[in-house]
């Protein structure tokens, strides 16, 4: 899958020029910060820190619009990268955390749950050519129960682990025939039964790395 970017306000150099509201000598209310590299923040401040809603425009053209809490991105946001990537969703203390959509410049889209900047929980991933996965993620990888549909017409429904078909699952070919059984590393490993498009058993037995070890014809 396409690599997901990450960038936060805390990575900026501390030196910046401020213009805006003050309270008791502190930045408080609405104001603008301009950093030495040309990065600019326009938005709300509280007790001398960025807090509330604002827009952070990096010198290279990346733009964050959304919530902040004590100098850290927090709440709902839209983050547009100069190269065309876009994230719309929740952030928690600088990390994508909660529900969000990441639209990649190449046309891939992930929509679903996040934790600590990676896909975590339930989500949907669509590739530029229209292939799609819907199911569970763990640590940024497909893990748990899910289903995939490829542009070729092939389908899979079952278990995943570490971004691979792993566990029990059914693979449906574009011609309507199916194979149901045990998978590991996206290959049949274990007992499986193959059916034709009408549902008749063609073959059943033990597979290893997609090769039959023991063939039993019904």
Where are these regions (language model features)?
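Glycine/tyrosine- and acidic-biased, solvent-exposed loop/turn segments at the edges of beta-strands
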Residues: 1-218
